[in-house]
Design a protein with these regions (language model features):
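Short hydrophobic targeting helices and cationic amphipathic motifs
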Residues: 2, 7, 28-32
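Acidic, Ala/Val/Gly-enriched low-complexity intrinsically disordered segments
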Residues: 3, 13-17, 23-26
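Feature captures the catalytic cores and cofactor-binding loops of soluble hydro-lyases/lyases
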Residues: 35-201, 215-249
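Channel- or pocket-lining gating/hinge segments that regulate access to a cavity or pore
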Residues: 210-213
Length: 249
């Protein structure tokens, strides 16, 4: 069933911290990773090959074509811009969501350790703090090592020069040298809002130079079929535009 999402733990950081105080020698990030590991060991992940095929198919379709098939309602705000130089022209993956306190990246660190190959980490920056970067070079490099398919942050980053050399798409609202808090609270794999769009864990994220599209998993098969048809039509219109016969509608 291509519309069956993978089952993953939802991690409320504040609740975990209250229930399981970390040891004196253990910092909070290490503690959260340990707790997440306990959850992961008891959770059976399910992701069918048909679902992965959907992601591969969406990676061949420009976000503009997808947006046109969805009533232009699932595109993130243009404040979220591409900062890296990834290989290819369109990128897609499965959303791993993070709800983060404004300017705090504690739960983003935990999500990086929790993420699997092909995931796209999507972060809401609650409160809109814009003078604290949520990620930098070390985290970008680790995300590339983990073979993630993208990072989408509704907040700023730093180490922009390094970001340009990272081979995966990195989207953010801007840059600042200011560092993040690392205190929490936050949650992983819960519904969030990023770039003005609702994102649920397991949704399909499609990215290109134009921006970021979110496709609800339950709609993915129908959206894919419609977008593929529209792409064929648009390609024919481009050819016609080259000889002056296109219907521009």
């Amino acid at each position: 069933n291509p519309e069956t999402p993978c089952r993953r733990p939802q991690i409320p950081a504040c609740a975990a911290a209250k229930s399981f105080p970390p040891a004196r020698t253990e910092n909070l990030i290490q503690f959260l990773i340990r707790i997440i590991g306990c959850f992961e060991s008891t959770v059976e992940y399910e992701w069918y090959n048909s679902g992965l095929e959907l992601v591969k198919a969406f990676a061949k379709i420009p976000t503009a074509n997808i947006a046109d098939t969805m009533g232009r309602s699932c595109a993130m705000h243009p404040r979220i811009k591409l900062f890296s130089s990834p290989h290819g022209t369109v990128w897609a993956g499965i959303a791993l969501t993070v709800k983060s306190r404004g300017g705090d990246n504690l739960l983003i660190h935990a999500a990086l350790d929790m993420a699997r190959e092909g995931d796209v980490i999507v972060v809401s920056n609650e409160g809109g703090v814009d003078n604290r970067s949520l990620m930098g070079e070390i985290m970008f490099t680790y995300a590339a090592y983990k073979k993630l398919n993208g990072l989408v942050l509704d907040g700023p980053i730093r180490d922009v020069k390094s970001a340009k050399e990272i081979p995966l798409p990195i989207y953010a609202t801007g840059s600042t040298p200011g560092g993040p808090y690392k205190e929490g609270p936050g949650e992983i794999n819960v519904p969030i809002s990023c770039g003005g769009i609702s994102v649920n864990p397991g949704d399909i994220v499609v990215m290109d130079d134009d921006g970021v599209i979110i496709i609800p998993l339950k709609d993915a098969s129908a959206v894919l079929a419609a977008a593929q048809k529209l792409q064929e039509t648009d390609e024919a219109k481009v050819v016609a535009a080259g000889n002056g016969t296109a219907k521009r509608e």
